[in-house]
């Protein structure tokens, strides 16, 4: 008698989740977690095929958020997310728009960019 193999993994279904968007001046990172903070999927603009100065564009950030949303919907059946944005980059708003256009319901958007209260000394100014 042949053994029957199961195809695919038994994955848990997560209806709600948190999308962490780290938008720097040179890159954008998207990390999707469950409500406990366990990472379900993570990607960046460089992993989606962009390189050089094209990584810092809002279009690239939208594309990476779009691919992350499609993967999470397909794998885990996620429908509702809350978004946490960190960093001063240009791609944060484009990434949130891409999440909405992909079919995810965005319940809240929080900007948790770290702002120093005159803590550490800044880097030296660039001279051009």
From Swiss-Prot:
InterPro entries: Ribosomal_uS11 (IPR001971), Ribosomal_uS11_bac-type (IPR019981), Ribosomal_uS11_sf (IPR036967). Transmembrane segments: none annotated. Disulfide bonds: none annotated. Keywords: Ribonucleoprotein, Ribosomal protein, RNA-binding, rRNA-binding. One of its GO terms (molecular function) is structural constituent of ribosome. GO terms for cellular component: ribonucleoprotein complex; ribosome. GO terms for biological process: translation. It comes from the Bacteria. Pfam families: Ribosomal_S11. Part of the 30S ribosomal subunit. Interacts with proteins S7 and S18. Binds to IF-3. Belongs to the universal ribosomal protein uS11 family. Located on the platform of the 30S subunit, it bridges several disparate RNA helices of the 16S rRNA. Forms part of the Shine-Dalgarno cleft in the 70S ribosome. This is Small ribosomal subunit protein uS11. It comes from Wolbachia pipientis subsp. Culex pipiens (strain wPip).
């Amino acid at each position: 008698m042949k053994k029957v193999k199961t195809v695919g993994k038994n994955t848990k279904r997560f209806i709600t989740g948190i999308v962490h968007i780290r938008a720097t001046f040179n890159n954008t990172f998207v990390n999707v977690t469950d409500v406990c903070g366990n990472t379900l999927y993570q990607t960046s603009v460089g992993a989606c095929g962009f390189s050089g100065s094209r990584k810092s564009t809002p279009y690239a950030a939208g594309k990476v958020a779009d691919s992350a949303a499609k993967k999470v919907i397909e794998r885990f059946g996620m429908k509702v997310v809350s978004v946490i944005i960190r960093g001063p980059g240009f791609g944060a708003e484009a990434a949130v728009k891409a999440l909405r256009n992909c079919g995810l319901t965005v319940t809240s958007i929080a900007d948790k960019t770290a702002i120093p209260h005159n803590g550490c000394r800044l880097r030296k100014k660039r001279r051009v």
